[in-house]
From Swiss-Prot:
The active site is at S102, Y188. One of its GO terms (cellular component) is extracellular region. Substrate binds at K353, T354, G355. GO terms for molecular function: beta-lactamase activity. InterPro entries: Bact_CellWall_Synth/Modif, Beta-lactam-related, Beta-lactam/transpept-like, Beta-lactam_class-C_AS. Belongs to the class-C beta-lactamase family. The lineage of its organism: Bacteria, Pseudomonadati, Pseudomonadota, Gammaproteobacteria, Moraxellales. This is Beta-lactamase. It comes from Psychrobacter immobilis. It catalyses: a beta-lactam + H2O = a substituted beta-amino acid.
């Protein structure tokens, strides 16, 4: 009986093994097909929504060309539209160089964070430590952290436009007096973070442009990003277009490199976005510098202020993002509540920054916790709120389906 039972068991086992293997194979194949189909559907939805938003924006604001770099769950996608140069009929590509405008400020913050990690700078230092000429002045007594977070007491947004040389620049800072107490309000300003970037370079005993182009960008492997576009890359440098449709590029100005002077491509800026989310390998100290930029120093009614970045706790709403990127928020003083001490590095947030020159408009937004974000480049300046709406709609189309 034992042998018979054993024989029956063996036969039963040999009968079921192929059936189980077949069932598993069918199940795995079905899951793979389903996953592939879902990924294809998601890619289709993404492309359709980007197409829709790009066509609407280009038609409404007469934008000649746009480039989108998008990361969804760690995977990069690129979409290009229109012309980089209307006269030459040159199409936009991932290698087209656009002006970033104030998105450049995120590189100034990165250099400073890197300098702090090297021990050459502290955000609690005052400006006069690096520029002795500013001793016994309001700005000289101001901490660097207040400069980079626009909370020093009120620099007007475009005050640098009237200055023509370093002598006039230092005289302006020396004679400046705050409009309101330090750390009481936020007033966005090129003069504030521009000086901060300038001091960051002084702390490392070098020139700002050289440090960005020879230290920061190579560390991030951003090979087509520049302060000064070299001669052999001018063919890839798009023309911007003003309200009259005339081709223009950014003019030199005081502290332009620090505040608004960097040019880049959608491929490079998507890599920059990926590095900020820890999705690509970069030098460990540079990675820590990128992460440290997302500490929260104070709160406005709309967002938490990091180093150059504005951060919105998830889940956020389109209304919050539009409010935080509105003209009023940029140009008018906003009451703040200090975080003492600053928050740890924030990941479960919508991180963003707008940027523009007279002929270009840019927007970057990413969510480290979701490994998702996007960059929009255009060779015409158009409203910040429209960039925000487009980005939110595009990312929502793939994340909530």
């Amino acid at each position: 009986m034992k042998l018979f039972t054993s024989t029956l068991t063996a036969k039963k086992s040999s009968t079921h093994k192929p059936l189980i293997s077949l069932a598993l194979s069918v199940l795995i194949s079905t899951l793979l097909i389903s996953e592939t189909a879902q990924a294809a559907d998601a890619n289709d939805r993404l492309e359709q929504e980007v197409d829709k938003q790009a066509k609407q924006l280009m038609a409404q604001y007469q934008i000649p060309g746009m480039a989108f770099g998008i990361i969804v769950d760690g995977k990069s996608h690129f979409y290009n539209y229109g012309l980089a140069d209307k006269q030459r009929n040159q199409p936009v590509s991932e290698d087209t160089i656009f002006e970033l405008g104030s998105v450049s400020k995120t590189f100034a913050a990165t250099l400073a964070s890197y300098s702090e990690l090297n021990g050459t700078l502290s955000l609690d230092d005052t400006a006069d430590k690096y520029i002795p000429y500013l001793k016994n002045s309001a700005i000289g007594n101001t901490k660097l952290i207040s400069l980079v977070t626009y909370s020093a007491g009120g620099y007007h947004y475009r005050c640098l436009k009237t200055l023509e040389n370093n002598k006039e620049l230092l005289q302006y800072y020396k004679s400046w007096h705050p409009d309101f107490p330090v750390n009481s309000k936020r007033l966005y300003s090129n003069a504030s973070i521009g000086l901060f970037g300038y001091i960051s370079a002084l702390s490392m005993h070098s020139d700002y442009t050289k440090l960005i182009e020879n230290t920061v960008l190579p560390s991030l492997k951003m090979t087509n990003t520049f302060v000064d576009v070299p001669a052999n890359k001018m063919e890839d440098y798009a023309f911007g277009y003003n309200a009259a449709g005339e081709p223009i590029r950014v003019n030199p100005g005081m502290l332009d490199a620090e505040a608004y002077g960097i040019k880049s491509t959608s491929a490079d800026m998507t890599r920059f976005m990926a590095a900020n989310m820890g999705l690509v390998t970069v030098d460990s100290q540079m990675q820590q510098a990128l992460d440290n930029n997302r500490k929260g120093y104070y709160r406005t009614k709309s967002f938490t202020q990091g180093l150059a970045w504005e951060m919105y706790p998830l889940p956020t709403t389109l209304q919050q993002l539009v409010e935080g990127n509105s003209t009023e928020t940029i140009l008018q003083p906003q009451p703040i509540q200090l975080n003492e001490p600053p928050t740890p590095v924030l990941n479960d947030v919508w991180v963003n920054k707008t940027g523009a020159t007279n002929g270009f408009g840019a927007y970057i937004a990413y969510m480290p916790a979701k490994k998702t974000g996007m960059f929009i480049l255009a060779n015409k300046n158009y409203p910040n709120t429209e960039r925000v709406k487009a980005a939110y709609t595009i990312l929502d189309s793939v994340m909530n389906n």
